[in-house]
């Protein structure tokens, strides 16, 4: 995956600059042109909307490689049965992490960093957790490969127009950036 290091650098820069990273997706087409969408996710409905916009944008722009990165909570796996019902954000042994995940038709990769903060919530350091990279890379919930541009399967113009229409009512929830974004903000 050609752009993994570039996206990893961007994710680390964002958390150092802003202190947090919203759910972000970056897609690349066959010519290496990129587009990026992100939003603050508050609930499951937001996740669904983000997933739909991500899928549509990958399809419309024939993405052949994509990356997702975000900060969140990871819990220890040695919890007993009663603790399993606790949401990760409420688990006292939770760890804040920055996850960067990428996928192309042939490969997938992930990098996990434990986020270390001081009492004032300022970022102190990002500790690479190489022991978790493979587990995250193989997590089926992370995969969106069906949305990538498949060289054997081309989306028709009709498919793309249908997806553009589905994305049109959601302009207010996504922020688009880039000097020349592939995506037209009016459609998203």
Regions found by a protein language model. Give the residues of each.
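N-terminal domain-onset segments
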Residues: 1-54
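Low-complexity intrinsically disordered segments
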Residues: 52, 57-188
């Amino acid at each position: 995956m050609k752009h993994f290091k570039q996206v990893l650098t961007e994710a680390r820069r964002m958390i150092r600059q802003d202190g947090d990273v919203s759910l972000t997706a970056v897609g690349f087409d066959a010519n290496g042109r990129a587009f990026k969408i992100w939003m603050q996710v508050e609930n499951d409905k937001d996740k669904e909307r983000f997933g739909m916009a991500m899928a549509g944008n990958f399809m419309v722009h024939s993405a052949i490689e994509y990356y997702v990165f975000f900060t969140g909570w990871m819990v220890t796996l040695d919890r007993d049965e009663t603790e399993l019902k606790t949401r990760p954000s409420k688990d006292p042994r939770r760890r804040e992490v920055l996850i960067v995940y990428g996928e192309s038709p042939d490969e997938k990769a992930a990098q996990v960093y434990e986020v270390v903060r001081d009492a004032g919530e300022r970022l102190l350091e990002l500790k690479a957790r190489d022991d978790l990279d493979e587990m995250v890379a193989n997590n089926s919930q992370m995969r969106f490969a069906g949305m990538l541009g498949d060289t054997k399967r081309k989306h028709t113009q009709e498919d793309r127009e249908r997806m553009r229409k589905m994305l049109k009512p959601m302009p207010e929830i996504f922020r688009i950036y880039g000097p020349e974004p592939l995506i037209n903000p009016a459609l998203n």
